[in-house]
């Protein structure tokens, strides 16, 4: 399986990489949060742009991106607008969503974008091609905050992302039972062993699914999300605790 390299970070080998989400509402809080995050132990900075209030002002959005880039120049920056239908803060039209991601790609400030699988097949394919033409990697994602589908469906979604040339397919699902967590882990393992030719990221959410955030190296998930301050999804644990556990499992 090929790895994905962003800056000096190699994703898809060794212990899962730690992603943290920054969720600031304005320029001032982007600055203060960035300074606080700079001291934390993580690998990839995800900027959750759907939390930003002034989204209609693309110049303001890119000014905030510039602050993040300048504050943490060595960290890969993942630009993520999470749609309301997949658990984000604000609803957005498909056209505005694509335009915002293209503006981020054009800016030269971001290393990766998050692109939701169910945005629309044509829009997804075109945006992936546009990102790759500008040397920006694509994390293609799907989130269900209500349920966990069957393993076959989980694998089908990850394979579809791979067929759309996502650099890193990602899926996050809500378990209704402990067996749902096993379904996610079994699907991850089957995908990793039989179909994946690139790194994938999977997780089962909430307290029930915490084990999936820790056991990525065992089952085949290349990255996991931790919390510096406020968790961006249910079940995230602090980056310090997360790094400790990932290191223990890696060295075992």
Swiss-Prot record:
- One GO biological process term: chorismate biosynthetic process
State which residue ranges cross the membrane.
Answer: none
Q: Does the keyword Lyase apply?
A: yes
GO molecular function of the protein, one example?
A: 3-dehydroquinate dehydratase activity
> Its function?
Involved in the third step of the chorismate pathway, which leads to the biosynthesis of aromatic amino acids. Catalyzes the cis-dehydration of 3-dehydroquinate (DHQ) and introduces the first double bond of the aromatic ring to yield 3-dehydroshikimate.
Q: How does it assemble?
A: Homodimer.
User: Could you tell me what this protein is called?
Assistant: 3-dehydroquinate dehydratase
Organism of origin: Escherichia coli O6:K15:H31 (strain 536 / UPEC)
Q: Which gene encodes it?
A: aroD
């Amino acid at each position: 399986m090929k790895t994905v390299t962003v800056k000096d970070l190699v994703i898809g080998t060794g212990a899962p990489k730690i992603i943290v989400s920054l969720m600031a509402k304005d320029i001032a809080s982007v600055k203060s949060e960035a300074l606080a995050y700079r001291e934390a132990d993580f690998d990839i900075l995800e900027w959750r742009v759907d939390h930003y209030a002034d989204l209609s002002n693309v110049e303001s959005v890119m000014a905030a991106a510039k602050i993040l880039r300048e504050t943490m120049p060595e960290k890969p920056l993942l630009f993520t607008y999470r749609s309301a239908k997949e658990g984000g803060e604000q609803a957005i039209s498909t056209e505005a969503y694509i335009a915002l991601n293209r503006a981020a790609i054009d800016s030269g400030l971001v290393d990766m974008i998050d692109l939701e699988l169910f945005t629309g097949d044509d829009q997804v394919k075109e945006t992936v091609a546009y990102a790759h033409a500008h040397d920006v990697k694509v994390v293609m994602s799907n989130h269900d905050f209500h349920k966990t589908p069957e393993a076959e469906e989980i694998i089908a979604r990850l394979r579809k992302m791979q067929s759309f040339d996502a650099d890193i397919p990602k899926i996050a699902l809500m378990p209704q039972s402990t067996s749902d967590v096993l379904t996610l882990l079994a699907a991850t393992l089957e995908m990793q062993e039989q179909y994946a030719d690139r790194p994938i990221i999977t997780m089962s959410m909430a307290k029930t699914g915490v084990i999936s955030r820790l056991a990525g190296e065992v089952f085949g998930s290349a990255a996991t999300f931790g919390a510096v301050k406020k968790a961006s999804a249910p079940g995230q644990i602090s980056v310090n605790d997360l790094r400790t556990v990932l290191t223990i499992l890696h060295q075992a």
